[in-house]
Amino acid sequence: MKKSILITLMISLSLLIAACGNGNTASNNGNNEEANNDTSSTGTFTIGVIPAQTEGAMEGAMDKLQSILTDELGRDVEVEVYPDYNGVVEAMNYEKIDMAYFGPLSYVIANDKSGAKAIITQLIDGEPFYHSYIITHSDNPWNSLEELLENSQDVNFAFGDPNSTSGSLIPSIELQDRGVYQSDDEHEFASVRFTGSHDATALAVQNQQVEAGAIDSAIFNQLVESGKIDGEQIRTIWESDKLFQYPWAVHQNTDEETIEALQSAFLAIEDQEVLDAFGATGFTEASNEDYESIRQAALKQGLIEE
């Protein structure tokens, strides 16, 4: 009998200890959840940047931008230039970054894949627009795209990154409409290459490694103004219609307080090195609707689905 009572007491004590342990575990889980939430709002804020120019050309400016945003947001900010446009799209898709600097096309793709939300774009002389240029060396005889394409089989042509709007999407549609380009494997040129960035395309044309190339007008103008490219050696032979400028987009779950703080910080940026890295003169607010024309172009090319 005593033995039975002792066993009953031991079982009761074990259950009591287990219950207390579960209570502590629940409490600890709650604390961990709170800690995780705190980290999401005050931990390092990560920004991925497409290589609009080669990484070395952007490094100093990105360090400055990182410092500016760290001060304005009151939290650590880390800015990283990715080796290609698609890397930034995938980083947003897999939640490796909180914000991204996209080209219009890469933004449309990211919005389609992960719900990325445009909140800022850049200004060029007070306007949020730019163009796609097709350029050639001034030693060449062509003064227009029509003249260039008369003997397209003798032309080595350069695009930028495959996911660039002005360096690939828009000029490729123009060349398709003119019947000389379907893809990098099917075309009427001597060769087609992708340089990976706008400054690399400009240098390829200037150094006569290719006869013509597609480039962002704002970055081209900035390269000339900075002396990185000799404007006397380059001729623009085609210009697209206006394109809405490159967006800065956040993860779809970003809270409004953070969005407003980011918008305020970007609108206040006046540092010339930072602005020059993007070929910009300032920043302004943006929305998803600003990129509807690019979305339609991406649908036409089969880059996204309806």
Regions found by a protein language model. Give the residues of each.
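Periplasmic-binding protein-like
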Residues: I50-P51, L123-Y133, K228-S264, D276, ...
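Ligand-binding clefts/hinges and TM-proximal coupling segments of bilobed small-molecule sensing domains
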Residues: N22-N28, E150, N156-E174, A261-E306
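Extracytoplasmic "Venus flytrap"
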Residues: N36-M62, F283
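Short helices/loops that flank or line small-molecule/ion binding pockets
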Residues: N86-A100, K113-S114, Y130, E150, ...
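C-terminal motif of bacterial Sec signal peptides marking the signal peptidase cleavage site
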Residues: L15-A19
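A conserved helix-loop-strand patch within extracytoplasmic ligand-binding domains
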Residues: L123-V180
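A ligand-binding cleft/hinge motif common to bilobed small-molecule-binding domains
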Residues: Y101-S114, S172-D177, Q206-N207, E211-G231
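Ligand-binding cleft/hinge of the Venus flytrap
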Residues: K64-G74, S166-F194, Q222-I229, L299-I304
